[in-house]
Amino acid sequence: MLSVMVSSSLVLIVFFLGASEEAKPATTTTIKNTKPQCRPEDYATRLQDLRVTFHRVKPTLQREDDYSVWLDGTVVKGCWGCSVMDWLLRRYLEIVFPAGDHVYPGLKTELHSMRSTLESIYKDMRQCPLLGCGDKSVISRLSQEAERKSDNGTRKGLSELDTLFSRLEEYLHSRK
């Protein structure tokens, strides 16, 4: 199970940071820089908002979680950290949160709020050249493993949101 988590994390990080900045032609007009900041502290407020929202629904989400921790501290360390983080965030945004609406219909407002905030962080991270990475070869295998878990994977994923937020924060700080 741990190797699946580490592999999943590795894939996420590789994919997550795959964005690169396109070359822009030189112009004589000064254009205001609208790119997001790339410093970890630029994400602190949004991460705190995620934690506050999760804290309100944590008992409900963790009530049915009888699995061991998937997102251990090694997932964002090392050369695969960017791929793992990318895969994890995409997985949460594309699969876990949408499935959570069906598994926990009474928590739709909170889940939508957390998803929206996480989408904002993810979008900014993808646009930050300092957070880019390349190799995406492991992503497919990890995605297939996660898909086999179905609703149990959704429950597990939502119950570990606080751990995801911690790993995201660790990752952002490691890229200074």
From Swiss-Prot:
Gene3D superfamilies: 1.20.1250.10, Interleukin-10, domain 2. One of its GO terms (cellular component) is extracellular space. One of its GO terms (molecular function) is cytokine activity. GO terms for biological process: immune response; symbiont-mediated suppression of host dendritic cell mediated immune response; symbiont-mediated suppression of host innate immune response; symbiont-mediated suppression of host type I interferon-mediated signaling pathway. Residues 1-25 form the signal peptide. Disulfide bonds join C38-C128, C82-C133. It is found in: Secreted. Its main location: secreted. Glycans are attached at N152. Keywords: Cytokine, Disulfide bond, Evasion of host immunity by viral interleukin-like protein, Glycoprotein, Host-virus interaction, Inhibition of host innate immune response by virus, Inhibition of host interferon signaling pathway by virus, Interferon antiviral system evasion, Modulation of host dendritic cell activity by virus, Secreted, Signal, Viral immunoevasion. It comes from the Viruses. Homodimer; disulfide-linked. Functional viral IL-10 homolog. Can bind to the human IL-10 receptor and compete with human IL-10 for binding sites. Requires both subunits of the human IL-10 receptor complex to induce signal transduction events and biological activities. IL-10 signaling pathway has several immunosuppressive activities that are exploited by the virus. Inhibits TLR-induced type I interferon production in host plasmacytoid dendritic cells. Belongs to the IL-10 family. PANTHER family: INTERLEUKIN-10, INTERLEUKIN-19-RELATED. This is Viral interleukin-10 homolog. It comes from Human cytomegalovirus (strain Merlin) (HHV-5). The gene is UL111A.
